[in-house]
């Protein structure tokens, strides 16, 4: 009995020890897990008020100054709220003295001659059910000017009064050949309605365009013969050519690889080409920096922007189409036209020869004498925008940097003398000063082969360069826009600052193909296929960043982007899983051939002419490469990158047995902001995903 009791005692002791060991083991496992969960909760608690301030309360939203110059350049008007008025009223300011005068009129006055009111102010054009009508403001009589039948999918728009007020030019758009697609209309969830909308997909029919002229008293339309019967084309501009008998039309080929400026003589019924250019890639891209032309010398000559020598430059041509001179020689790009001041003999333009992330004002003599010179004062980095008065004496000058909100000044030319400050954005400026402990770093990444890419990096305020940090890459990477710009940009920049404070390095890189002012070869490097080049250069840029900055942890890399950036996120996750571990793709287009013709065909033509380019550009074809954690976010009400384009990828990933996360916001469009709380919810959802799969903080 005694031996048996001892054995039972030993068994109980062993059992107790086993339980204690098991408890210790469970506690050891639970402790780190609990710590991780608490850390995530703490991070969410920290960032949510900041994001709420960004997306719901507008705490970091800077005010923009919007003034309209008076025709005589003596001053400007600003719509302001005044006591006793429910709506904003125009307030006039004298440019020289600053004297303020409140007008009795409401809203902004539209300039005469462009669309609405006639040059003499006595007639008004309006658009109704696809047709143009004219109302006599004196007697109230209405005249119908165009006769398209309702339901024909034909619209007559973009009306332009002739200088003498006797004719109206307009553009007719015929969408009847464009295929219809069905879209669910929000309503009864059991019996939703469907509406039909036309969508010009890659390779399909596009709108048929015509330019017409009709007498202001009514009558038959005179159509300009600017195309062959079955020719597809777009119009860059259509306007009166400085008189009431000639029209200027900028005609762009379907693939935007050719453009012609046509001068139509209405009385003679003749059309002649005064400028023409072509390029195997494109001549006018979606960002349209070199579109249109400007008449000078009373219409005897014109200024046009072209990239025909490899740089975006200004040229002077005679009205007959003879080139007179290259106005802006040199290895630099014009970013955009600003002002032609013929009285003083200057052409003003934006450029930044030494830094593709910034923008300054330059000028060059119209007669070709001298070299381009910088007008923006030295020592003021960032982005500078200018809006001139008609006579060129007064200017609204707005400048900002990535970390400082815009300030608008009234400046007097030619000396760039500051007269007064019109908008300081003092509230936001003070808020940013209290938040920003470290300035955003702009840097250059040399990946070899002569390719040097601009990038920015946002680090947490308690950044310790002796440790390693996870990286979140923000990507766009397509030809429509740059992300690396030294200018105030909300709300993305504010979001990235908030995310960085959690313990991430937020990085963005502009690869070749983005519209940086670095020459035509840089921008056209992606011609034929959007996706492959950007994916490789983004990855190589990240490696170069880590090579030069040892605190970059390449074992913890996330990437996110919206629209084209969403597509590049998918390509990164599918094609470079060795580099990227977590991705968030918002509103992507993983099947390029299903996107709209107006954008995609500029850069890739169609599948019929470029099948391999479309195969390489479509992320769906590389989905088997997914190894990391992927979140796809989309709006079911998309009118840009339709939901079906993404659902095809969802089906493919399911077929491949790939695990991923997918979030759709009902009835939201491309911006995914409709509905109360949507923007905040989306951003918090992204943050949760990062915290779960790419834990922040140094190691």
Predicted regions, residues:
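Predominantly five- to eight-bladed beta-propeller fold
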Residues: 36, 98-100, 145-159, 170-226, ...
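Serine-hydrolase catalytic core recognition
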Residues: 236-237, 244, 250, 376-377, ...
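Short coil/turn segments that connect the beta-strands within blades of beta-propeller domains
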Residues: 74, 120-122, 164-166, 243-245, ...
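Beta-propeller domains
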Residues: 188-194, 199-324
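A short helix->beta-strand "capping" segment at the edge of beta-propeller domains
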Residues: 39-62, 219-226
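Non-catalytic accessory segments flanking enzyme active sites
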Residues: 64-68, 73-90, 100-104, 108-109, ...
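Short loop/turn segments that connect beta-strands within beta-propeller blades
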Residues: 95-97, 136-140, 215-219, 266-269, ...
